[in-house]
Regions:
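Second-shell residues forming the walls of enzyme active-site clefts
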Residues: 1-152, 157, 165-167
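A short C-terminal boundary segment appended to hydrolase-like catalytic domains
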Residues: 153, 159-184
Length: 184
């Protein structure tokens, strides 16, 4: 929370990742789909950092390409259960939801990259990174042309960074003085 607040003071928005958690799996979602077999009742500790950051004004979350079969049959980044029910309704999150990179191995089960993008949007994602694959980006843009959700657009506009305070203004704040004392 302190890091997020410091970023906000500096004019930046923070993104919490990888909701609902990536810590109890072995597989690397860049290459394969990790599976976490714990039931939702055992994931409360994983959700606590998100709950705290949301209560303190978190503006965006990136969802994980991790499958939690005891909760939903779709991985979190393609799951309305995780994005709409748990994150938005359960934790009260109103900010932007990023998919993890749709070109990753953990997303491959969902079909072509444009199909992955459509499934992520249907689940509730607002922004869809597609890294290092220009042809897939172009195919996705063509296939999803006109699919913009006005509510997603509003959430994304709210992410625009705040004007960064002048360095001299920052030096006059109590936070600056406190940090300086800690460093010295």
């Amino acid at each position: 929370v302190a890091c997020m607040q410091g970023m906000r003071t500096g004019g930046m928005a923070a993104t919490a990742k990888h909701f609902p958690g990536h810590g109890a799996v072995v597989a690397d979602s860049h290459k394969a789909l990790p599976i976490d077999r714990r039931p939702l009742t055992e994931l409360t500790d994983e959700l606590l950092p998100y709950r705290r950051m949301i209560a303190n004004g978190l503006t965006s979350v990136m969802v994980a390409h991790v499958l939690f079969p005891e909760v939903d049959e779709a991985p979190a980044g393609f799951s309305a259960r995780w994005i709409q029910q748990e994150l938005r309704w359960g934790l009260g999150f109103t900010g932007a939801v990023f998919s993890d990179d749709l070109s990753m191995g953990g997303a491959a089960f969902a079909g072509t990259v444009p199909e992955r993008a459509r499934r992520a949007i249907e689940a509730g994602c607002d922004l869809l990174p597609i890294c290092n694959d220009r042809p897939a980006v172009l195919a996705t843009l063509t296939e999803l042309e006109g699919a913009a959700d006005p509510l997603s657009q509003v959430r994304l506009v709210r992410l625009h960074g705040r004007p960064m305070p002048a360095r001299e203004q920052l030096r006059k704040t109590a936070q600056w003085a406190e940090c300086q004392r800690a460093i010295d």
